Amino acid sequence: MISIKNLSKSYDDHSGHQKVFENVSYEFGDKGAYSIVGSSGSGQTTLLNLISGLDSFENGTIEVINQNLSILSVEERSALRKKYFGFGYQFHYLLENLSIYENCLAANFGIDTGNIDKTLKKLGIENIKNKLPSKVSGGEKQRASIARALSKKPSILILDEPTGNLDQENSLVVQDFLLEYAKTNNSLIIYATHDVAFAKRADKTLNIIERNIVQE
């Protein structure tokens, strides 16, 4: 479903020219859970942004569902994301003027409200669905962000530190739900995490080492 071939990515910062990836190749399957680990600043979030078409690269190709991202326009990449992707981040980006339920409904386009209710319940936040984001805790916002990402049943789910703001109990609830979701819905879930135990629960773990992707 996602194919990376001979990818190189770099950027300039206050320290000079920094290489993030150099001649990297990897094939993600059509389904299953993939975790991405690495030291701080190694490129976990950059990799997520690259495969979802949110960031550019110098050399190589990334194909998503047989579409070459490097030749797609900004509008075409956006359309691809809307059709196939769901996103959940450590920092939630919920619409503050909408309730938790309405945030999910907006992402779902009002197609399947039953799926929204089911997801909120499994994530343990059905009791806050009518509250505004400003009225709930950081951990609840993070789970709401995941619920919103899943509300349209995406083929590809991209998650950046999905359990970063959660206590151990709620972290396990989210982990169990996501891994079961990947199995029962034949979806591809790719998540970056610094939680070693959570990373090891994935079907495959990718470690970013010295500008390369190494499957453990």
What do the PLM-derived regions correspond to, one by one?
Residues 151-155:
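A short, proline-enriched helix->beta-strand linker immediately N-terminal to the Walker B motif
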Residues 60-68:
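Conserved ABC transporter NBD signature motif
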Residues 69-86:
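ABC ATPase NBD coupling module
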Residues 68, 113-128:
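Conserved ABC ATPase "signature" region
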Residues 52:
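Helix-to-loop junction immediately C-terminal to a conserved catalytic motif
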